[in-house]
Every structure is written in structure tokens, then in C-alpha cells.
């Protein structure tokens, strides 16, 4: 009994330290966020419901909205991958990648070759991976291999021999940032089934987006705050801003607001955003996802919307 009590107490202390560190890093990042008050006023004039949503993200999650950003949507993982490879090959200054799953195969081998080559060229190449998501798929000497290739690497929340509550905190992000003004995100991990080079459940349908412009700054700050939490290495964040390496004007595709969620507070930002979009819908709701895992609140919300119509 004493052993289990020790595990529970030690695990709780570890989790509390994790939460404190994550909260501090998250709050410290806010000073680098630009004010979006003028853009919020513009959105308010265009759409009250969009304004409520954007204001919630800005005030609660802390991520501002931007204008000067082009967006490209990829309906399939293989489309996203082809463009990702192209942009990685164009990197001149830095590459930041943060993913939940990495599996050896054609997709990862292609990306790794580019990362290694770019590191040799002097590009700052960094990788964050979730230790749980990758534990069954990468070799035990993965970190050593990456460092030998010149790639800086950090494992999110490494799995220990003793279970504690902190092990439930996982990093499900899928983010790539290239030279500060090119960003990729979506549902695509670095594994062959996501680009249909390997079939586990038939044709895999997942989506991704590419951003080019000012809004990539939110993705950069998400990565850097996690990097600081995992490594203790504090960067000069301003040296990674979108304007640093791209002096041409950014093309605007309307208002863009990348956001992040965190396990260290009681606010379920991601879920609230989706529920709010469903609740505010007037004509239709289209949902596409390879994983339909929903709770009772998420089930009831579409039902209420159907009844309302």
C-alpha cells in the first residue's frame, strides 16, 4: 500500500510541476503576440458570429487573428505531402516540426533526408515528437540518430517505467514551420498510411492546410514555447518572425487565426470552438474526419441543430 501511495503522490507532484512550467511558458509567450484589436473591429462589422468566435480564441487561447496570409487546402494527405516536400527543399534558415506519430517508411525517409541535408547546409532543423505516439514505431536510438544527423530533437513527455497522471498529457499537434512564413498543419502525421502508401483501413482520408504569411507566427510560437518547456532553451523569438526572411508583401486570403489548446487549464478551447460553429450554423454543417470519437455533448449539439430546423 505504501508503494502505491508513493507512486500516486510522486506522480501528482510531477504533474503539478509540468502544469506550472507549461502555464509559465504559455503566459510568457503572450508578450510576443501582436495586438489584433483593429482586425477584431473589422470582423465585427462583417459578421457578429465570426467576431464572437475570433474574440474567444484571442482572449481565451491567447492567439490573435491576422489578415495577410494565403491559405491552401489539401483534401488528401498525399497532396499535402507533395507540397510539404517542395517547401522543405526551399528552406534556407530554419525548419520546425512537431508531430504526434512518426513511422519509418517512404514519407518519413523522404522528410528525414531533407532535414539531414538542410542541417548540413546550416539550416536550424528541430523536431518535437510525442514519445507515446512514436514509441512503437521509432528505434530506441532515435534521439541519438537525429543528433548525429545535425537535427535538434526533443521528446514530449517521455514514457517512464512508472505510470503517473502526467502520462495522459500528449502532444497531438501536427505542425511544420519553414523560415517563419510557411506553415503546415492539419490531421496528417508522418506515416505512410496518411499518404496512402500503406493501407491499414482502406483509402485514408485526412486533410491539411498550408499557410503563407503573418499567421504562421502563431504556429511558430506554439512550437517555441513547447521547445522551451522540453529543453530549457530560450530563443530570441523575434528572430523567427514571418517578416524576418520574407520581405515581399504577403497575399491575403481573409482572416486567419491558428490557435492551440493546452492540457494545463480547465478550458477545452478546441471543443468549444467546434461546438460554437455548429451552434451558429444557419444553413448546413459539413464534417469530415477519419476519427469519429465524440462525447454526449458533441452528439447532442447536432441533434439540437436538426430539431431547430
Please give the residue ranges for each predicted region.
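Helical hairpin unit composed of two closely spaced alpha helices linked by a short loop
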Residues: 291-309
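N-terminal localization/anchoring segments of enzymes in phospholipid and broader phosphate metabolism
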Residues: 1-276, 280, 307-308
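Histidine- and/or cysteine-centered catalytic micro-motif in compact active-site loops
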Residues: 263, 290-291
Amino acid at each position: 500500500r505504501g508503494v502505491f501511495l508513493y507512486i500516486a503522490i510522486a506522480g501528482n507532484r510531477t504533474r503539478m510541476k509540468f502544469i506550472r512550467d507549461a502555464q509559465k511558458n504559455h503566459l510568457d509567450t503572450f508578450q510576443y503576440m501582436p495586438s489584433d484589436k483593429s482586425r477584431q473591429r473589422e470582423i465585427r462589422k462583417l459578421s457578429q458570429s465570426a467576431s464572437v468566435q475570433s474574440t474567444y480564441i484571442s482572449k481565451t487561447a491567447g492567439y490573435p487573428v491576422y489578415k495577410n496570409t494565403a491559405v491552401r487546402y489539401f483534401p488528401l494527405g498525399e497532396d499535402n505531402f507533395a507540397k510539404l516536400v517542395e517547401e522543405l527543399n526551399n528552406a534556407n534558415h530554419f525548419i520546425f516540426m512537431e508531430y504526434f506519430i512518426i513511422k519509418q517508411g517512404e514519407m518519413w525517409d523522404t522528410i528525414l533526408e531533407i532535414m539531414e541535408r538542410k542541417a548540413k547546409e546550416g539550416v536550424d532543423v528541430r523536431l518535437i515528437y510525442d514519445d507515446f505516439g512514436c514509441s512503437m514505431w521509432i528505434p530506441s536510438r532515435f534521439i541519438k540518430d537525429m543528433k548525429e544527423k545535425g537535427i535538434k530533437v526533443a521528446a514530449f513527455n517521455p514514457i517512464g517505467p512508472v505510470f503517473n497522471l502526467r502520462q495522459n498529457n500528449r502532444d497531438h499537434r501536427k505542425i511544420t514551420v519553414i523560415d517563419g512564413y510557411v506553415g503546415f498543419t492539419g490531421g496528417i502525421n508522418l506515416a505512410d498510411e496518411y499518404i496512402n502508401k500503406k493501407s491499414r483501413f482502406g483509402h485514408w482520408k485526412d486533410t491539411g492546410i498550408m499557410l503563407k504569411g503573418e499567421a504562421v507566427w502563431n504556429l511558430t510560437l506554439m512550437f517555441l514555447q513547447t521547445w522551451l518547456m522540453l529543453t530549457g532553451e530560450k530563443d530570441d523569438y523575434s528572430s523567427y518572425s514571418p517578416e524576418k526572411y520574407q520581405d515581399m508583401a504577403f497575399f491575403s486570403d481573409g482572416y486567419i487565426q491558428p490557435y492551440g489548446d493546452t492540457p494545463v487549464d480547465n478550458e477545452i478551447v478546441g471543443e468549444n470552438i467546434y461546438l460554437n460553429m455548429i451552434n451558429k450554423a444557419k444553413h448546413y454543417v459539413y464534417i469530415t474526419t477519419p476519427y469519429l470519437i465524440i462525447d454526449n455533448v458533441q452528439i447532442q449539439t447536432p441533434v439540437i441543430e436538426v430539431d431547430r430546423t
